Amino acid sequence: MTPSLANFISSLTAGGLVVLTIAVALIVISRTDRVTRF
């Protein structure tokens, strides 16, 4: 595995974790908050 490929995979994993964390937070907030903001 080349270093650039390893960096790409690690950045992809980090980005996926960030997106997953934001998605979970949004779901929790939307379930606990009954006021529709959209």
Swiss-Prot record:
Q: How does it sit in the membrane?
A: Single-pass membrane protein
Q: Which InterPro entries match?
A: PSII_PsbX, PSII_PsbX_type_1_subfam
> Where, per UniProt, does this protein localize?
Plastid, Chloroplast thylakoid membrane
- Keywords noted in UniProt: Chloroplast, Membrane, Photosynthesis, Photosystem II, Plastid, Thylakoid, Transmembrane, Transmembrane helix
Q: Which Pfam families does the entry link to?
A: PsbX
Q: What is its main location?
A: plastid
Any Gene Ontology biological process: photosynthesis
* Stretches that traverse the bilayer: 9-29
Q: Might you report a single GO cellular component term? A: photosystem II
Q: Which family does it belong to?
A: Belongs to the PsbX family. Type 1 subfamily.
Self-association state and partner proteins as the record states: PSII is composed of 1 copy each of membrane proteins PsbA, PsbB, PsbC, PsbD, PsbE, PsbF, PsbH, PsbI, PsbJ, PsbK, PsbL, PsbM, PsbT, PsbX, PsbY, PsbZ, Psb30/Ycf12, at least 3 peripheral proteins of the oxygen-evolving complex and a large number of cofactors. It forms dimeric complexes.
* Function noted in UniProt: Involved in the binding and/or turnover of quinones at the Q(B) site of photosystem II (PSII). PSII is a light-driven water plastoquinone oxidoreductase, using light energy to abstract electrons from H(2)O, generating a proton gradient subsequently used for ATP formation.
Name under which the protein is recorded: Photosystem II reaction center protein X
